[in-house]
Amino acid sequence: MEFSVQSSTIEQLQTECLIVGVYQDHQLSSAAVQLDQVSGGYLTRLLQMGDLDGSVGQSLLLHNVPNIKSARVLLVGCGKQDELTESQYKKIMQQMMHAINATAVQQAVCFLTELMVKQRTIYWNIRFAIESIQASRYVYDVFKSIKAKVVGKLTQIIFNVANQQDLLEAERGLKHAQAIASGMIYAKNMANCPPNICNPAYLAELAQGLATDYQQIQTRIVDEAEMATLGMNAYLAVSQGSHNPAFLSVIEYNHHPDPSAKPIVLVGKGLTFDAGGISLKPSDAMDEMKYDMGGAAAVYGTMKALAEMQLPLNVVGILAGCENMPDGNAYRPGDILTTMNGLTVEVLNTDAEGRLVLCDALTYVERFDPACVIDIATLTGACMVALGTHNSGLMSTHNELADELFTAASQANDKVWRLPLGEEYQEQLKSNFADLANIGGRFGGAITAGQFLSNFTQKYRWAHLDIAGTAWQSGVAKGATGRPVPLLAQFLINRAQQE
């Protein structure tokens, strides 16, 4: 799909379809008002007939509107004028695509980005429009013999802005939106790939591909032999039950004006399949454990978006690839592991493996002297119980960093909710035989997992995102969501603006 922005008036435009918004109570958007005036009150008379009441999700296709050069006009319901939310706006964009795809239209000019969405600027309206449109078009049919049919003939959408002053912000929104939408697609494709294909070596291969595609990126791969030399014994213990060796992929993006500037580090949990190990998971929905590398997929997609946006930052992305399987060589409940930073961990449950992989990865990244570290992980079902599937869990030992992430999440409409950490939760991680236990009991599971990780992040500013409830959807619409790429990309955009 080709996207562009322009600033023109309704009467000047000659395209296959104009797209304008109509609110409830017969209220017209500003573009619809212009169209109504040019057409001699055609829209006013039409609305009085009651064929469209302006509810979110409605649409009405018109042909040969008087005094309008365009062949078609699509009216899209936008709800109540002063109450339009980001979620409703995205639904409006999806309905627009559904209606257009039912026609032979190849090019359309869209005025819906003029809508007032919680006082968002044109930048955000363009961002959300493109992200929504690309999400609505996404299909993963790589392994289907019969590919999904291309729905509709639309190949170009031109977003019209109110004036020339808005064009610069609109173009910036366009650039960022296309990069972020592309990153989300990369993340979805990685996460949706089946685990017999997408193993730790596959993650490493894709990571190396970014270095081929972008001159600002260099990638190196840490294999199991190097991990053993480094003392990454917790990471290796998780991997030892699998025939697929672990690989830690290090993606370095260097584009800061000061080459010595401290990097932002993103660490993604990359369990390409998590059977639970000896503490075997129930078979019901175990297929979805291919999504246990959603954190790595998000980091991969974010690095793609970052390279497309060419932000003036230094960023390191870590894909902590591993597989957790039951086997005669698998690690056991009762094992005591010596982590890379020297702390010992008693394994009480082999299905609490993500934190064991991450604790060594979080120690590994100390070598970068990072400005901050954010780990992203489908870490706990407990986070889903606490927050559902709408908000990712946010935990941090640094309030300023947590506030930055919360702000970026709100801006990007990629929501998070902060959960506490503290010494009270550390008590739950006590072991009779080691420095730490790898689980903290029945209560507060998402928090105790974050608390466990905090023991390995003492040398830098750190935050943890638990995306177990947001990285993928189950049911009829099963598939990866691409989250939290928008949040992470926005965090990096904000950091770049501070430089």
Curated annotation (Swiss-Prot):
| PANTHER family assigned | CYTOSOL AMINOPEPTIDASE, LEUCINE AMINOPEPTIDASE-RELATED
Q: Which cofactor does it need?
A: Mn(2+)
Chief location bin = cytoplasm
Q: Which GO terms describe its biological process?
A: proteolysis
Q: Where in the cell is it found?
A: Cytoplasm
> Catalyses which reaction?
Release of an N-terminal amino acid, Xaa-|-Yaa-, in which Xaa is preferably Leu, but may be other amino acids including Pro although not Arg or Lys, and Yaa may be Pro. Amino acid amides and methyl esters are also readily hydrolyzed, but rates on arylamides are exceedingly low; Release of an N-terminal amino acid, preferentially leucine, but not glutamic or aspartic acids
Q: What class of enzyme is it?
A: hydrolase
Keywords for the protein's UniProt record, in alphabetical order: Aminopeptidase, Cytoplasm, Hydrolase, Manganese, Metal-binding, Protease
Bilayer-spanning residue ranges: none
Output the Pfam families linked to this UniProt entry.
Answer: Peptidase_M17 (PF00883), Peptidase_M17_N (PF02789)
Q: Which gene encodes it?
A: pepA
Enzyme Commission (EC) number: 3.4.11.1, 3.4.11.10
Q: What is the protein named? A: Probable cytosol aminopeptidase
Q: Which GO terms describe its molecular function?
A: manganese ion binding; metalloaminopeptidase activity
Q: Which domain of life is it from?
A: Bacteria
Residues at the catalytic site: K281, R355
Identify the residues that bind Mn(2+) 1: D274, D351, E353
Query: What GO terms fall under cellular component here?
Result: cytoplasm
